[in-house]
């Protein structure tokens, strides 16, 4: 029996786009010491496949991190299975705020060294000794306190389209880079309230534990992240201190939280907060593109990529063989191929 998906990704994506069955986008995580990651991974894959779950699941000795899509009619069966696993009983399931059911098109369950890459090598660090969880109402109360410093634990391209009012938003590309930046920024503020947030909670849970490990006393994290916050403020009629869009790592690339558009198109500078991946298979750069520029550049990030896209498929394939994209994934929104960004770098 195959324990991984062998089907062509493009075909699966087209199948998902045309599917009419309602699906619910769900995310969850749990820091827990898993001893046999391979066996746990295989068992989980078989059960998720049987439930027609799609998405990405990362398993590591430190725990599990999942962003998935579940057929809505099977959501309760999925919940029963998941809660039947001892360490996952009662784990928070974050349901998407703005969901079209097209978030994922295939299932990947991968074993990794860590569920969140952090670059830390301190064997005395215990990720389970986290900061205090706060709900939306408590978050708002802390946010109004002059002694509170709010820190966005996401990457620059995420906070670019949406963030909390008065939050420090480090200009970083990766979580491991951000940990060091935040540590340096806060080194003389150990007695103040440190209030951290991220998309669903997994990054600020590790970050809050690390800051406590470093001696910070009053460390708080937004329970359930932006996803749960948006749901709570809507259900309870609370003040919404988040503005813009919540970036998500699936086909949607974002959830609309408020109507505020705080970013600009990376090609013309027009107000826009819609992310896209360059249509050139040799690039796939993530950037912000308005509708007009999408038409002008045929969904590409630059004239160069648009010209490449017009070439016959076999020539495009040959060109891709000579490209070493390396860690280009972390150049999201920074490439100087993008017209507006190129102009900004020259004038900035």
Model-derived regions, located:
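Substrate-contacting helices/loops that form the catalytic groove of nucleic-acid
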Residues: 199
């Amino acid at each position: 029996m195959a324990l991984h998906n062998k089907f062509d990704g493009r075909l699966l994506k087209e199948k998902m786009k045309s599917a009419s069955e309602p699906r619910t986008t769900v995310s969850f995580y749990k820091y827990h010491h898993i001893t046999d990651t391979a066996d746990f991974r295989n068992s989980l894959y078989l059960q998720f496949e049987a439930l027609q779950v799609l998405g990405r699941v990362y398993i590591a000795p430190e725990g599990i991190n999942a962003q998935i899509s579940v057929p809505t009619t099977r959501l309760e069966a999925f919940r029963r299975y998941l809660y039947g696993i001892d360490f996952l009983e009662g784990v928070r399931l974050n349901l998407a705020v703005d969901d079209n059911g097209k978030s994922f098109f295939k299932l990947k369950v991968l074993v990794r060294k860590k569920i969140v890459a952090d670059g830390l090598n301190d064997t005395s660090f215990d990720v389970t000794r986290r900061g205090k969880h706060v709900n939306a109402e408590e978050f708002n109360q802390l946010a109004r306190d002059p002694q509170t410093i709010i820190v966005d634990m996401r990457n620059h391209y995420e906070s670019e389209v949406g963030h909390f009012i008065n939050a420090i938003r480090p200009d970083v590309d990766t979580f491991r880079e951000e940990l060091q930046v935040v540590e340096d920024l806060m080194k003389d503020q150990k007695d103040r309230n440190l209030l951290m947030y991220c998309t669903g909670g997994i990054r600020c849970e590790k970050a809050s534990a690390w800051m406590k490990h470093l001696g910070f006393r009053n460390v708080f994290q937004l329970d359930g992240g932006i996803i749960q916050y948006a749901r709570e403020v809507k259900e309870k009629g609370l003040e919404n201190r988040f503005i813009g869009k919540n970036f998500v790592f699936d086909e949607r690339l974002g959830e609309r939280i408020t109507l505020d558009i705080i970013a600009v198109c990376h090609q013309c500078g027009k107000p826009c907060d819609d992310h896209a991946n360059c249509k050139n298979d040799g690039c796939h750069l993530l950037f912000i593109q308005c509708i007009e520029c999408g038409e002008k550049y045929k969904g590409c990030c630059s004239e160069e990529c648009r010209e490449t896209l017009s070439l016959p498929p076999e020539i495009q394939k040959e060109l891709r063989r000579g490209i070493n994209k390396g860690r280009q994934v972390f150049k999201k929104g920074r490439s100087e191929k993008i017209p507006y960004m190129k102009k900004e770098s020259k004038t900035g």
